[in-house]
Structures are given as structure tokens and as C-alpha cells.
Amino acid sequence: NGTDMSELNTNNRYNEYTYDFYVGFSKNMGEHLSFSASITGEYYKTARYHAWAAYPTTELTYVMTPAHILQLSFTSDKTYPSYWDLSKSTGYISGYEEVQGNPMLKPSTDYSANLNYILKNKYIFSLAYDYQPDLFQQLAYQSTERLALIYKTLNWDYQQSFSATTIIPFKIGHWLDSHVTLQAEYRQAKCNKFFDLSFNHSKWIGLAMLQNNIILSTKPDIRMELTGLYLSPSIQGNYDLNHIWAIHTGIRWNFANQKASIQVKANDLFNSMEGNIDVTLRNKGQYMDMHTNNYSRNITLSFTYKFGGYKEKQHKPIDTSRFK
């Protein structure tokens, strides 16, 4: 007798239709106030799901004086699940771990409201609220029916966050130009139908980042970029994640009357951003500790030469995100 392999078939046909329209306008009301608004309407249809949706966007700018500017904005957008996540098939990582597709996934929406205060065209103070109904992400579930760890992408009820951000630039002489970014965020993720469970997970998260542009020499023209960041312990759905940190750096030499340059860049120099992540799950009988170790360090060497007044044409890249 042979083994039934029907569930291993990854051949799928998926039909998807979208119809949309766009309307927008902008208006200057005197010297101090400007306003713009737009709305995109969309009809989205698959074999298992169809819906009308509207995605409005507004922005209001009030210039009290050149040194004091207020900006209030509201944006909305959508994210579609990848075609792989929409597959009916099941893939097996090991005898214990498996990845299940979910053809019932629907798009998620992102609503964002931001209030920015810009002081002296340098200092930025921001308050933001972000609400994402039907957010989808892949999470792990320990089956209560068999010995299996199931990875599956599901739509949650929502994820929301409140954040306050401060950006402070400063200079030291003519050789150092720096920016400090500080952010405090409250994040909440809620899902009432996560297999046979539910979760309502929240946490305060802090981010600190320092970006430096350093002139090492003017003759020859040698410049350095150095960025460091720290993210406090955070959450992803019902997961708890440990803190992460990273250092990015690069050196550029400009010569031949600024027409030529050689640049060396190193991102995540110590492989600390994705190379050492601890995932903890403690939710209604679900108990898991997982350590991931990805290699995220990369070093690039590039040479650039500008011929005359040549300017590179900007080409819109093809969106391949849903094929990953």
C-alpha cells in the first residue's frame, strides 16, 4: 500500500481581482495654513472573500512662524497576504515542525494618525497612533491533538500602538553631524480566535538610536557614517522577544573633483540585530522557548563615477513581496 501524498501537493490556482478609484485635492488657506486630502476606494475579490474598502488620507500643516510648525496627518493603507501564505498546502520542516497555508486570509488595513511639532526646522517631536485591524503574521501553535508545532499565518483582531518620538540633531565643529532618536511605544496585539486559544498581549517598548556623519579628512575627502541602535524587549503577537542592538558603519572616499567615490559599508557589524534572538511563549498552556540565529551581517564595497551631468533615471521597482 502506498502513502497518501495528496496533502503535499503545492500546485495551486489563485484568482484575485481588484478595482479601485482615486480622488484628491489640496488647498492653501492663507500664508500659514495648508490642507490636502484624498481617498482611494477599492473592491477586492477572491474565491473566498470580497469587500469594498475606502482608504482616506489627510494632511494639515500650520506654520505659526518659520521656527514653529505643526503637522497633523491621517493615513490609511492595506497589506495583502503573500501567495505562499494563501496556499492550501502543508510544508514540513522536521518530523515535529510544519508550516500550514491559509487560503482564508484576508488583507489587513493600517490606519495611522500623527502629530508633529517641528522646532527651528531641526527638532522634531511626534505623537502617533497606529491601528491595524485584521493584521496577519505567522505564529507557532503547539497542537493539543498530536505532537506537532504548527506555524500558520492568521488574521488577528487587531494590533494597535501609541508612540512618542523625539529627534534631536546636533553638531560639533565642522566634523561631526549627529541625530539622536528616542521613542517610547505602547503596543497591544489581540486575537480571539488563534486556533482553539486567544491572546491579548501588550508591552511598553523603548528605542534609542544615534546616527553620526563624521568628516575624517577634507583633503583627501574621507567621510564616515556610524549608527548605533538599541531596542528594548518587545512583543510579536503572543511572543515575547528579547532586546536587540546593532552597529552600522561605512567609510567613503570622494576624489576626482567629487566625480568618483569608493565606499565600504558594514551593516549589523556584530551580527547582533538578527543573530541572537530569544523568543518566549507563555499563553494558556502554550510553553515554548526558541532561539534563532540568523546571519544578518553584510559588507559591501562599491565604486561610483559620474560622467558629466548624468543623472540616474528613477525606475519603479517591481513589487515581489507577495511571492516570498
Task: Annotate the PLM regions.
Residues 39-47, 74-80, 90, 121, ...:
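Transmembrane beta-strands of outer-membrane beta-barrel pores
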Residues 78-127, 131-133, 149-163, 171, ...:
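Outer-membrane beta-barrel signature, preferentially recognizing the C-terminal barrel domain
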Residues 31-35, 67-70, 121-127, 174-179, ...:
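Repeated loop/turn-to-beta-strand initiation elements of outer-membrane beta-barrel proteins
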Residues 255-324:
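C-terminal beta-signal and adjacent terminal beta-strands/loops
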Residues 13-61, 175-186, 207-233:
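Surface-exposed extracellular loop regions of Gram-negative outer-membrane beta-barrel proteins
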Residues 13-19, 50-54, 107-113, 119, ...:
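Residues that define the transmembrane beta-barrel architecture of outer-membrane proteins
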Residues 208-254, 267-279, 283-287:
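C-terminal beta-barrel architecture of Gram-negative outer-membrane proteins
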Residues 19-27, 58-62, 113-119, 164-170, ...:
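Residues on the lipid-exposed face of transmembrane beta-strands in outer-membrane beta-barrel proteins
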